[in-house]
Amino acid sequence: MMAFVAIYTVGRLKHSHEHPASREFFEVGNEVIRQAAKTGDLIKEFSPNRVLFPENAIKGEGSPILTLTVWKNLQTLFRFTYSGQHMQALRERNKWFGSHQERQPNYVVWWTEKVTDVSWKEAFKRYDSYIQHGPAPFAFDFKSAFDHSGEKILLK
């Protein structure tokens, strides 16, 4: 059975969209997505335009930056996240993003049989589940990861 992995990320810009730091973030972000597309491992990128965001994603300082993408598998997603330009962007994220609330993860990952089952609504549900119950096969992070059958695995 073919299974894909979805990742939902949540960040909050420190500055307005017009601020040079934010403009730099969008340039870097576009480049990172171009690189992701080139790998052949990125299956789908969802647009955040006209999405009704949940209250917890929008309240607070700074504008929310949310991404939702689907990948071929967990290993390729993990490798992409911690290499190349994306790794560089992670190192510089404090320039662009404010710090996260206690216990609020800035991303959540889950397995899906069908790309068509992935949606923003689904992402918000998985994120809430992670906040309430911690990492589980339903919603997890790279530190506490699960394989497609729900077994704990170590990513490296």
Residues covered by each model-derived region:
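Glycine/Thr-rich phosphate-binding loops that ligate phosphate moieties of nucleotide
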Residues: 67
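Exposed, tryptophan/tyrosine-rich binding patches on extracellular proteins
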Residues: 71
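An amphipathic, aromatic/His-enriched active-site/gating alpha helix that lines ligand/cofactor pockets
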Residues: 61, 74-105
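Short S/T/G/P-rich N-terminal loop/turn motif that feeds into the first structured element of a domain
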Residues: 1-64, 104-156
